[in-house]
Amino acid sequence: MNPSRLRAAAIALGLSLCGLGAVQAADLRLRLMQTSDVHMNLLDYDYYRDRPTAEFGLARTITRIQQARDEVPNSLLFDNGDLIQGNPLGDQVARAPAREGAVHPAIRVLNLLRVDAANIGNHEFNYGLPFLRRTLAGASFPYLNANVLSADGRAPAFTPTALLEREMRDEAGQIHRLRVGVLGLTPPQILQWDRQQLQGQVQVRDMVETARDWVPRLRRAGADVVVVIAHTGLEKHELPRLSENMAVQLARVPGIDALLLGHAHAELPGPGFEGYPAVDARQGRIHGVPAVMPGRWGDHLGLVDLRLRREQGRWRVVESQSSLRAIFDRARQQPLVDADPMPAVVIAREHEATLAHIRRATANTDTPIHSYFAQVSDSLAVRLVAGAQLAYARRAVQGTALETLPLLSAAAPFKTGGRQGWTQYTDIPAGPIAIKHVADLYVYANTIKVLKLRGAEVRDWLEMSAGQFRRADPRGPAEQPLLDPDFPGFNFDMLYGAPGELSYELDLTQPARFDREGRRISDGQRVQALRWRGQPLDDAAEFLVVTNSYRAAGGGHFPHLGADRLVIDAPDETREALAAFLAEGGVAPWAQAAPGWRLRPVPGLSLQLRTGAGALAHDAAAAGLRLVRELGDGSALFALEADR
C-alpha cells in the first residue's frame, strides 16, 4: 500500500475509533414506571358507593402510563403487588368457580399493558395458594418473589428474580443490549396475617437477608441494572430482622440501583417523608438509592428516571429523579386525566356480575350508618361488626368449657379518610342494606378468631388502641389535633361486650403506653373507668375476645396477641357473619344502645378532628363534636366539645 493510502486508512480508522468512543460515552436514559396496591380497583368505579369516581382506578393510571411511555425512548413497567384483593370485584372473582384456562381479569389487564415484571404483595395470599398459583399462571410476564420459601425452606416458592434483556437507545441514537435484573420481596408477616392459608405450606425469610443473597447473584448473571421491587414501606427507626417495613434497611444493600416500594399506601417522593433519616423526600432517594412509592388504588403512577453511563465496562447510575404523577387534583377536587377504555372492555363481564351481587339487599336500617366520627366516638359502623362477631362467637362456644367465660369483641373502623381520600368513609343511608354496604362496613377477607386473655391484657389492648391519639397538652396551644396521622385507623380497636356490659373512657392528657410497634414506652394510663357489668374490670379475670384473623395473628403489633392465645380458629369470613347478623335484625339493638366508650374532653382545649365533608350531613353533636369549618378540599374540621 502506498504512503498516501496508508495515511488515509489510518485517518479513517482513527475517525472510526473516535466515533466508537463517542458511542460508548453517550449516556442512556431509562424510565422505570410502577403501580402498586391497586387492590382490584381496575376501573374508576367505587363499588362501595356504587358509582364512578375520578379519584382512583387503574383505568386512569393507564392514561398516565401511556403518556410517560411516549415521553422517553426507554422504559419498563412494573407492578408491586396487592393487586388481586381489596374490593367486591376481587371477592367476586375469587368466589366464582374456576374455569379451565381462564385468566384472572387483573392479569388480563396487566398483560395488555405490557408489564415487564411484577411482585407478589401480602394480600395476594388472602385467597390461598391454589388460587394465587392459578392467577399467576395467566401472566405473560414474570411474577416474582424471593423471600417466600417452600415448606422445607430449601428453595423459593415462586420465581425469585428475572433478568430482562431489552434493546435501549442512548442519547446518541445508538442501540445497546441492556440487562435489567429484578428481585421481588414481600413482608414476612404473611405467615401471621394468612396463617390459616399458609401454615405448613411455606416459610419466609427476612427481606434484607434475601436481598443480600440475590442481588450479587443478579450481578454475576450479567445484570447491568438491578431493580428491587419490595412490597414494603419506611420507618424512621432501625428495625429487627423479619420486620414489615424495611425500605431504609434495603437501601443499604450494595448493588441495588433502584427501589420500587409499596404496601404502606404512602407517597414518595412527598412531604410525608420529610425528616425521615436517610430519606431525600424531594428527589426520592433512600441512602442515595432512587426510590418511589405510588400511593394506592392507582391514584398515582410512580416514576424513577435514571441516567446511565458506561464506565469501566459497565453501566452505572450517575443521576436519578423519582416522581409521582397523580390522576386527581385533591386540592381542587378535579380529575387530571381521563380513563383509558381498555379495562372496562376487558373486565365487562366480571364488573357486571359484581354490580349484580353488591346491589342485592339483605337487611334494613332506620338509622344512617357512617364512619366520619368513628375514630373519636362510639360508632354504629363499628358496633355492628362487634355485635356480629359476638353473635358468631356465642354460638361457637355454646356447649363447650369456654361458654362460662365473659365474651368481648374487638372491632375497628376501616374507612377513615386521610391518606385514603376524604370520600373514603362508610356512609350508609337509612333504608335497605345491600351487600355493597356489608362490604363497606367490612372491607377485608378476614376470618373470625377467638382469643383468651386476662383482664390486664384486655386493658393493654385498649391502651395500644389509644396510641392513635396525640397527647393533649393542657399548657399547649388552645387548638390541638386529636389524631396521629401515622396510626392506621384499622388499628384503632374498640372493645365491646353485649350492649351495656363494657364501658371505658380515654384520658388523652396521659402519655401513650405503647408505640406503633407494640413496645411499651411509658406507664401511661389513658384507659380510665374501665368497667365490666358496672364493676371495675378485674385484671386477673379471664375473658374471651373475638377478633379477626389479622389481629389474632399479631397484625398491628398489639401486645399479648398471637397464635398461642387462640382458642377458636373459625374458618368463616367476618363479612359472612356480618351479613347474617344484619339479616337477623342486628341493627336495632346496637343503634339504641348507649355509647360504650368516650373521650374525656380537656377543659380549655379545642381537640380537633379532620374528617370528610360528608360528615356535614350527620349529627356531630351526638358524637360530642362541633363544626369548626369546612376546608374546601373535601374535608371538614370538627372540635371535641369540652362541656359534653
Spell out what each predicted region is.
Residues 26-31, 35, 41-67, 174, ...:
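Catalytic centers of hydrolytic enzymes
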Residues 24-326, 384-388, 397-400, 407, ...:
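Acidic, metal/ion-coordinating pockets
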Residues 6, 19-23:
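Polar alpha-helical coiled-coil and adjacent low-complexity
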Residues 10-19:
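Bacterial N-terminal signal peptides
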Residues 2-10:
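Bacterial N-terminal signal peptides that target proteins for export
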